[in-house]
UniProtKB/Swiss-Prot annotation:
This protein's name: SID1 transmembrane family member 1
Short name of one Pfam family: SID-1_RNA_chan
InterPro entries: SID1_TM_fam
Compartments where located: Membrane
Predominant localisation class: membrane
Chain ranges on the Extracellular side, renumbered to this chain: 20-309, 464-494, 563-572, 622-626, 705-710, 763-791
Ranges for region Disordered: 344-409
Record topological domains on the Cytoplasmic side: 331-442, 516-541, 591-600, 648-683, 732-741, 813-827
Membrane is among the record's keywords: yes
Keyword Signal attached: yes
Biological source species: Mus musculus (Mouse)
Membrane-related topology note: Multi-pass membrane protein
Family statement: Belongs to the SID1 family.
Length: 827
């Protein structure tokens, strides 16, 4: 028995010795596992660029190991392709890729969710692994990449695996790179800033608009968000159909490099496309949704271009100041010479008499109130207290009570002026105290300043919020820029679009200076009791001109605010003061020959508020709602008729609930009972043409329902303004009045500059009417100084055209300064 025990100990001694030695405990386990492994298992040293096929199930899992080496200064990436013929969504093939610091996993078929619970399945998936960076200190970096393929399918799922190295992972500068992507096969590449480049523009182009895609720029960090549901989690991104462009600055990337990610969306809804018709629930979509892309990264402009472009903008508009100063000096020299020669005021007004003389045979007896005694007309006559029915006052006395506004109802009460005279002259409609009327027109100026302050401050706050949201979220679909020519500065994404509005501010201020000079000269003439300032020419009331200058400046400010982040929500920032400018110009034209019966500032600005409200409603509801266009067209036509009635009857036709009954009576008596010639033929012709134009606009909108309602409304205002201005100039020439060289030059300059401005306006570099991706299809390169685009040139030219337009209104009747007011016809 003892011998048997000794024999057993001797047999077990080698095993005990091996167990006591460290490191020998795992060896039998490893050998045992190796014995249990399938000899065909490819996990033992898998190769790149080789296709591996296999079947995985609940009891079978395959692991592949790849040895990847990264060298200093060389960035390479690995891409994993997995394809599965299994369409069972309950038991997909699960792929897990393990790297040194990262884990990436997905399933095949890959499932994407769309709108309204729609799903899209992709049975071929390719993903790029986040590259590991080798440094000079560590030398070549070797790492193992494990690809684990598994499935919970009870009967097995077939798959194919291919792992490749990306040869062209780093994008070059100024070289186009072509590639293909799909929703389940996203792509991303690396870009490093060159040493001499501070900013770059990523330009992406595709020949076909769809499928919709997303271009994203992300910092060098893992994981890289390259799927539809997570691409918006990091970095800067924008949707794309045919074009995309992102401007980046080196200072925003600490490592001076970034990833450019390209993701194809499973649906085109975000880009303005229609829904795909999914015939088979488990259909493979890769072939249908692949997209060929071309990416080019080019250096952006340098800081010197910013400085040069800014100085260019300032000097261009400062030249207008120099030109106006030169004109003032020339005018001053000529005035001094005339004063020395004694020739000023020597004109007797011949040739300035109106062609439309009073026809006494056709007027009722005793209706010669306000008629002209031509034998006494002389520009050299002295002041008469009975002339014009008012004494002369100096404007130095500013103590005018508010009640004074309604203390002179001559025009309202003396119906003979309106009802019995066939031909009116300016003296008939300039009978109120000049100080009171001037105060009335100054309300336009003070009210527009109040409106501008209360309007601009919340606008600025809102656009700053928009810009902050864009910078924080990286969502460049919020703002509709021309991304191919959007140059950032500080927190602003498109500084060039803001700088180009400087012209409105500078030229608006210059116009205010010109009006102020004229105002001061006129006040001095009144203080000196100059006969020409008191009884000759168009009565000088500068309140509307001041309001026009402020409106021009505010148009520049609000246009700049709009271009901080132009989009669907803030379009009215840019258009509201355009309506006001057009309206003020029409009011000024009417006030020129009707100084005592013009609209009050309160009713005028209230009308502008109604117009802006209608514009907002039109943009919101006017795209598809027929009922809105019916209501708007009815309002448009009725407003045109009401305004025409007021203009024709010089404000004597009251607008109240009985207007329709009175209008029917007038129509019956004047047009049906006895068809008589209109009393005011010229006015009637203008109003008929104006109504035809406005009714045409109304029916055009009702039939075609234009999508850009804001531009449609602005077109109505501009056409009415041009029509009224053309009528005014024609009637002025028809009345044998002269047009001096300065207004002729301003008219010609206005026509030329407006034509050029409209050419650039209709280039349509972006549009918030569609999706951001559709808007980017219209983007174009810069055309001026590599800094300004076509829309910036529109800003320059439109500011200049508005300035010349204002000068036309300011100087058009300068020839009447030596003509008696009772010889200036009203039209």
């Amino acid at each position: 028995m003892l011998d048997c025990l000794r024999l057993a100990l001797l047999c077990a001694l080698p095993w005990l010795l091996r167990a006591a030695v460290p490191g020998h405990q795992e060896e039998p386990l490893a050998k045992s596992a190796e014995l249990r492994r399938d000899p065909r298992d490819p996990a033992r040293g898998a190769d790149f660029d080789r296709v591996y096929s296999g079947v995985v199930s609940l009891s079978t899992e395959n692991i592949y190991s790849f040895n990847h080496t990264s060298h200093p200064g060389q960035v390479t990436a690995v891409r994993v392709h997995v394809n599965s013929s299994s369409d069972n969504l309950d038991y997909p093939v699960l792929v897990v890729v393990r790297q040194q610091k990262e884990v990436l996993s997905w399933q095949v078929p890959l499932l994407f969710q769309g709108l309204y619970q729609r799903s899209y399945n992709y049975q071929e998936v390719s993903r790029t692994l986040c590259p590991s960076k080798a440094t000079n200190e560590t030398g070549p970096l070797e790492q193992l990449i494990f690809v684990d393929v598994a499935s919970m399918a009870p009967h097995g799922a077939h798959y194919k695996l291919l792992v490749t190295k990306i040869k062209h992972f780093q994008l070059p500068t100024n070289v186009a790179f072509y590639f293909t992507a799909s929703p389940s096969q996203p792509q991303y590449f690396l870009y490093k800033f060159p040493e001499d480049v501070d900013s770059v523009i990523i330009k992406v182009v595709s020949e076909k608009a769809y499928p919709c895609s997303v271009v994203s720029v992300q910092n060098i960090m893992c994981p890289v968000y390259d799927l539809d549901h997570n691409v918006e989690f990091n970095g800067v991104y924008q949707s794309m159909t045919k074009k995309a462009a992102i401007t980046l600055q080196k200072k925003d990337f600490p490592d001076e490099q970034f990833f450019v990610v390209f993701v194809i969306k499973p649906e085109d809804y975000a880009c303005g496309g229609s829904f795909s018709i999914q015939e088979n629930e488990n259909q493979t979509w890769n072939l249908q949704r692949s997209k060929n892309l071309k990416v080019t990264i080019v250096p952006s402009i340098k800081e010197s271009v910013y400085v040069k472009s800014s100085l260019f903008s300032i000097f261009v508009f400062l030249s207008f100041y120099l030109g106006c100063l030169l004109v003032v000096l020339v005018h001053h020299v000529r005035f001094q010479r005339k004063s020395i020669d004694g020739s000023f005021g020597s004109s007797d007004g011949s040739g300035n008499m109106a062609v439309s003389h009073p026809i006494t045979a056709s007027t009722p007896e005793g209706s010669n109130y306000g008629a002209i005694d031509e034998s006494s007309s002389s520009p050299g006559r002295q002041m008469s207290s009975s002339d014009g029915g008012q004494p002369c006052h100096s404007d130095t006395d500013s103590s005018v009570e508010e009640s004074d506004f309604d203390t002179m109802p001559d025009i309202e009460s003396d119906k003979n002026v309106i009802r019995t005279k066939m031909f009116l002259y300016l003296s008939d409609l300039s009978r109120k105290d000049r100080r009171i009327v001037s105060k009335k027109y100054k309300i336009y100026f003070w009210n527009i300043i109040t409106i501008a302050v209360f309007y601009a401050l919340p606008v600025m706050q809102l656009v700053i919020t928009y810009q902050t949201v864009v910078n924080v979220t990286g969502n460049q679909d919020i703002c509709y820029y021309n991304f191919l020519c959007a140059h950032p500065l500080g927190v602003l994404s498109a500084f060039n679009n803001i700088l180009s509005n400087l012209g409105h501010v500078l030229l608006g201020f210059l116009f205010l200076l010109i009006v102020l000079r004229r105002d001061l000269l006129h006040r001095r003439a009144l203080e000196a009791k100059d006969i020409f300032a008191m009884e000759y020419g168009i009565p000088k009331h500068f309140g509307l001109f001041y309001a026009m200058g402020i409106a021009l400046m505010m148009e520049g400010v609000l246009s700049a605010c709009y271009h901080v982040c132009p989009n669907y929500s803030n379009f009215q920032f840019d258009t509201s003061f355009m309506y006001m400018i057009a309206g003020l110009c029409m009011l000024k034209l009417y006030q020129t020959r009707h100084p005592d019966i013009n609209a009050s500032a309160y009713s005028a600005y209230a009308s502008f508020a109604v117009v802006i409200t209608l514009t907002v409603l039109g943009v919101v509801f006017g795209k598809n709602d027929v009922w809105f266009w019916i209501i708007f067209s009815a309002i448009h036509i009725l407003s045109s008729l009401a305004l025409s009635t007021q203009i024709y009857y010089m404000g004597r036709f009251k607008i109240d609930l009985g207007i329709f009954r009175r209008a029917a009576m007038v129509f019956y008596t004047d047009c049906i009972q006895q068809c008589s010639r209109p009393l005011y033929m010229d006015r009637m012709v203008l109003l008929i043409v104006g109504n035809l134009v406005n009714w045409s606009f109304a029916f055009f909108g009702l039939i075609y329902r234009p999508r850009d309602f804001a531009s449609y409304m602005l077109g109505i205002f501009i056409c009415n303004l041009l029509l009224y201005l053309a009528f005014y100039i024609i009637m002025k020439l028809r009345s044998s009045e002269k047009v001096l060289p300065l207004p002729v030059f301003c008219i010609a300059a206005t026509a030329v500059v407006w034509a050029a401005a409209l050419y650039f306006f209709f280039q349509n570099l972006s549009s918030w009417e569609g999706t951001p991706a559709e808007s980017r299809e219209k983007n174009r390169e810069c055309v001026l100084l590599d800094f300004f685009d076509d829309h910036d040139i529109w800003h320059f030219l439109s500011a200049t055209a508005l300035f010349f337009s204002f000068l036309v209104l300011l100087t058009l009747d300068d020839d009447l300064d030596v003509v008696r007011r009772d010889q200036i016809p009203v039209f």
